[in-house]
């Protein structure tokens, strides 16, 4: 079996990647562009990738390909319909980040409520050293306990975020689907969550109905001074509308671990805004990436490959 790993830098270098037990050849590339994909994969039986695009046109030129093993949960980079038509299996990994993502979200909540980014930025400019008092009060500090958290997406991540939030004294509301006519038990109507929540956190999948879920209209329905957190998918948010809501002061702040385009352009409006807005926190899509989570991820990727090859030999 010929295995090609197309974007190995999607795994931190200090995490060792196990090799399959069956006889194989292993070729690894740090990055692969769209123009390089076909040449690198044309003789491969198995491809490992995180984000390299496999659309219908690309898949049609890879007759030897049997399996695409994705080092992530999302499968948006693969045309699943075309892959099925061509007999190419696609395997992703779920559940590996069920601790690290919720912990990241809780950390962002505390960072926003206590204005940590602003205080940290000030210290690079020695502002405390210039103070005439033992402290100073340039940024608002509000308690997490007693705040209301609106969770959009009640899967394993959203549920765990809610559990942790309850543990630190927050009230948790799970939002019903935006256009739902009936509100399920355990959920709160979509607009009501926007109205009540001091913090909104996004954990829903990216679909045609959730793209731009948070836009100018929904932002206007949020409580003035509320915070927005997104560790889900970048396109869940209309980025320009978010910048406007921050600039006008309608939102108290935002924390993002994902963007519409990744990596973002240097002139992305949010990237530019973060340079001057202490209430805007951006982390580079690393909420999922604790050492234990990544170790679990690569282990499950290899398990997917091993199981696929075993099934292949049984046919």
UniProtKB/Swiss-Prot annotation:
Binding site for NAD(+): 73, 156-157, 231-233, 257, 285-288
Alphabetized GO MF terms: NAD binding; oxidoreductase activity, acting on the CH-OH group of donors, NAD or NADP as acceptor
Entries under Gene3D superfamilies matching the protein: NAD(P)-binding Rossmann-like Domain (3.40.50.720)
CDD domains found in the cross-reference section: 2-Hacid_dh_4 (cd12162)
Keywords: NAD, Oxidoreductase
SUPFAM superfamilies attached to this UniProt entry: Formate/glycerate dehydrogenase catalytic domain-like, NAD(P)-binding Rossmann-fold domains
EC number from the UniProt entry: 1.-.-.-
Top-level taxonomic group: Bacteria
InterPro entries: D-iso_2-hydroxyacid_DH_PdxB (IPR050418), D-isomer_2_OHA_DH_cat_dom (IPR006139), D-isomer_DH_CS (IPR029753), D-isomer_DH_NAD-bd (IPR006140), NAD(P)-bd_dom_sf (IPR036291)
PROSITE patterns (UniProt xref): D_2_HYDROXYACID_DH_2 (PS00670), D_2_HYDROXYACID_DH_3 (PS00671)
Top class in the EC scheme: oxidoreductase
Catalytic residues as annotated in Swiss-Prot or TrEMBL: 233, 262, 285
Similarity section: Belongs to the D-isomer specific 2-hydroxyacid dehydrogenase family.
Name the UniProt record assigns to this protein: Putative 2-hydroxyacid dehydrogenase HI_1556
């Amino acid at each position: 079996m010929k295995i090609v790993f197309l974007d190995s830098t999607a795994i931190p270098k200090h995490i060792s990647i196990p090799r399959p037990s069956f006889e194989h050849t292993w070729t690894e590339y740090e990055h692969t562009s769209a123009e390089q994909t076909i040449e690198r994969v044309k003789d491969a039986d198995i491809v490992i990738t995180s984000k390299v695009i496999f659309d219908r046109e690309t898949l049609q030129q890879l007759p030897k390909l049997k399996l695409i093993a994705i080092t992530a949960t999302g499968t948006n980079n693969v045309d699943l319909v075309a892959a099925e038509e061509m007999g190419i299996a696609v395997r992703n990994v779920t559940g590996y980040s069920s601790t690290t993502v919720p912990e990241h979200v809780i950390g962002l909540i505390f960072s926003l409520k206590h204005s940590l980014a602003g205080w940290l930025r000030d210290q690079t400019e020695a502002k405390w050293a210039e103070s005439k008092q033992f402290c100073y009060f340039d940024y608002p500090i509000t308690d997490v306990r007693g705040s209301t958290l609106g969770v959009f997406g009640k899967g394993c991540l959203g549920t765990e975020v809610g559990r942790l939030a309850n543990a630190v004294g927050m009230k948790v509301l799970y939002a019903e689907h935006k256009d739902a006519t009936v509100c399920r038990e355990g959920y709160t109507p979509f607009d009501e969550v926007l109205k009540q929540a001091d913090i909104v956190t996004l954990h829903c999948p990216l679909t045609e109905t959730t793209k731009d879920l948070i836009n100018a209209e929904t932002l206007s329905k949020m409580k003035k001074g509320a915070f927005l957190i997104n560790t889900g998918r970048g396109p869940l948010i209309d980025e320009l509308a978010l910048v406007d809501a921050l600039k006008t002061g309608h939102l108290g702040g935002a924390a993002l671990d994902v963007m519409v385009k990744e990596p973002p352009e240097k002139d992305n409006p949010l990237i530019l805004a973060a340079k001057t807005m202490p209430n805007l926190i951006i982390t580079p899509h690393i909420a999922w990436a604790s050492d234990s989570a990544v170790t679990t991820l690569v282990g499950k990727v290899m398990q997917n490959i091993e199981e696929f090859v075993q099934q292949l030999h049984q046919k």
